[in-house]
Amino acid sequence: MHSRALALLVTAALVGVACSDDNGVTIPAELEIYTAQLNGANEAPTAVTTTATGHAVVTILGNIVTWQVDVDSPIDSLIAGHIHRHAADSVAGNVRVDFKPGSAWSAAATGQGVTGTVALGDTTLAAPGDSMLAIIREGRSYVNLHTRANPGGEIRGTLVRVQ
């Protein structure tokens, strides 16, 4: 995992040192790193009984958001993953970044991991980029992985800034 996380950080650093948003305002190029520990006990409004666990690393550099999500123990029928906005402790929040599942999820289910990158203003965002960055920076976001057995989410963890 450490080599993948390092590769993720290097990639994020190479993508852009200084960027500007759609309004021409320069966005600081300070690397920000957030992590989340994923488990069923973190699911809301009701915890999920599961042996599945995982972790996520999300980096922000300028207007570039990069993620790596790893499943640390087996999870069955993984179908989706997202960064959500916390609505309240007992309520699921809106999807802000969709990890775009597909063939990559079979790799995550065996512990390989899923990575991706999105730029502020990119059409793959589920919400405007500025609000997405704000909710991550303000500690109001979480990573959630969904399965066929638990379509509302099987493992979840709040993103916490570590750098």
Stretch-by-stretch model annotation:
Residues C19-G81, R85-Q163:
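Metal-centered catalytic cores of metalloenzymes
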